[in-house]
Amino acid sequence: MPQTTDEAASVSTVADIKPRSRDVTDGLEKAAARGMLRAVGMDDEDFAKPQIGVASSWNEITPCNLSLDRLANAVKEGVFSAGGYPLEFGTISVSDGISMGHEGMHFSLVSREVIADSVEVVMQAERLDGSVLLAGCDKSLPGMLMAAARLDLAAVFLYAGSILPGRAKLSDGSERDVTIIDAFEAVGACSRGLMSRADVDAIERAICPGEGACGGMYTANTMASAAEALGMSLPGSAAPPATDRRRDGFARRSGQAVVELLRRGITARDILTKEAFENAIAVVMAFGGSTNAVLHLLAIAHEANVALSLQDFSRIGSGVPHLADVKPFGRHVMSDVDHIGGVPVVMKALLDAGLLHGDCLTVTGHTMAENLAAITPPDPDGKVLRALANPIHPSGGITILHGSLAPEGAVVKTAGFDSDVFEGTARVFDGERAALDALEDGTITVGDAVVIRYEGPKGGPGMREMLAITGAIKGAGLGKDVLLLTDGRFSGGTTGLCVGHIAPEAVDGGPIALLRNGDRIRLDVAGRVLDVLADPAEFASRQQDFSPPPPRYTTGVLSKYVKLVSSAAVGAVCG
């Protein structure tokens, strides 16, 4: 029977489910390639199937990634069941918790670029048709999403899941839930004589009771929530703990989903639109998530060729209330978010208030609004997640600053702030170690504005996280009385008066490089302003004496990184 016009049109628009792997499976000249693939398990009938890369950052160095080998196997089951052929490969992951506070932290942010690059290299070289990207640690999540955006193939992201809280029994007989951030704060308390060494040891032994990423709304959980809001992971998949076997189901369905995306011709950039990034920003703001989300969402948007800027964070943050009472400043952890319905609870509340774009496409092949209608998440419980009518703060948990000290911008986590204005006296340190020494010596006091510079993307290099110093400041009882400013960045576990991502950075001659001990600094959160209170002419004259220090690394990956990396104001991207 002849085809109707509609039938012919339908056939002509069916996507090629092997848009790339034909390069290695089809034709006489591909005999050698097929021979290699036969050696890893493929048979004649498999060469007609789409080849799906299962990219995993599994390793044995950190609990964040331990579940990924199990989940990768479930993903492969899903790919097989949907008619695809999975091929697993690995990439690196750096543990921020282990690399914090020493030279190793220089290598953390660059690992994001290495992950994205390595996934791109394998996907391009082997001509894989689509991917499921598995990650558990802070930089591996954005690294995988950057790769997906750059490649613009069918792709689904899958999170390893968070760790459950530990339970520490202290010397006074009390017990409390603890996360890794408690260890950093305990060090500061112990150094000031506010906690015994025995209690530090008890906390150390309890903070990581098993596998999974750090349990509060720190960077990994923030980015997992953002990935779900972007539409790049299955709805409801961000919150379940790593040990929860629901994750195996999400893994299998992720494998099935990527094959269906191939059949429908849906690629990552069809999902990663400007509106999708606005949804992710809104969810991060409502959760009071990590300031690292600013850096990472800018970088993912760059790879997706989406124009995203700090101004977008300011605009959205001013209209989205902060709803989640979660650590590091609140009482709850990600498993508590899971217990009350997960990320979809926040998304539905924001969608109902007109604060999300419900028509954004997701990896299910449906829109975000359609996904939420299908799973019918409950309303906020009022404890872990507040209703919009009763927010913790009327605006989002992250604020973008500008001013004479940050002409290109800076970022402050305002979730947990008690006041809007802080004015203090500059204590200037070139690097984190000098500031830690001063704190341990007791020379940092109430009213100080501690400036840690030459820690930016180029100057660090690597834009180290300052959790060692912020945790020590809080542990020393100075968390609400000392302002910390840096061209570096902060851990998702940071709380207190902390301004990071100051741009331009010191090594580029930004105003932070010109600060001197005794300068007065003013932070106005409500006004979104960060200023040095100095005579403008006198302050500008200091530029004549500025000379950047020599590079810390002249060989290796960081030497390359310094030559390529851009300002934190645009995501610290390379190219």
Swiss-Prot record:
Please verify whether the record's keywords include S-adenosyl-L-methionine. Answer: no
At what positions is N-acetylproline found?
P2
Q: Which residues bind [2Fe-2S] cluster?
A: C64, C137, C214
- In which pathway is this protein known to take part? Amino-acid biosynthesis; L-isoleucine biosynthesis; L-isoleucine from 2-oxobutanoate: step 3/4; Amino-acid biosynthesis; L-valine biosynthesis; L-valine from pyruvate: step 3/4
Q: Name one GO cellular component term.
A: plasma membrane
Give the residues the record marks as binding Mg(2+).
D96, D138, K139, E465
InterPro entries for this protein: DHAD_IlvD/Edd (IPR050165), Dihydro-acid_dehy_C (IPR042096), DihydroxyA_deHydtase (IPR004404), DiOHA_6PGluconate_deHydtase_CS (IPR020558), ILV_EDD_C (IPR056740), ILV_EDD_N (IPR000581), IlvD/EDD_N (IPR037237)
Q: What is its EC number?
A: 4.2.1.9
One annotated GO biological process: isoleucine biosynthetic process
Looking up SUPFAM superfamilies in the UniProt record yields: IlvD/EDD N-terminal domain-like, LeuD/IlvD-like
From the Swiss-Prot or TrEMBL record, give the protein name. Answer: Dihydroxy-acid dehydratase
| GO molecular function annotation | 2 iron, 2 sulfur cluster binding; dihydroxy-acid dehydratase activity; magnesium ion binding
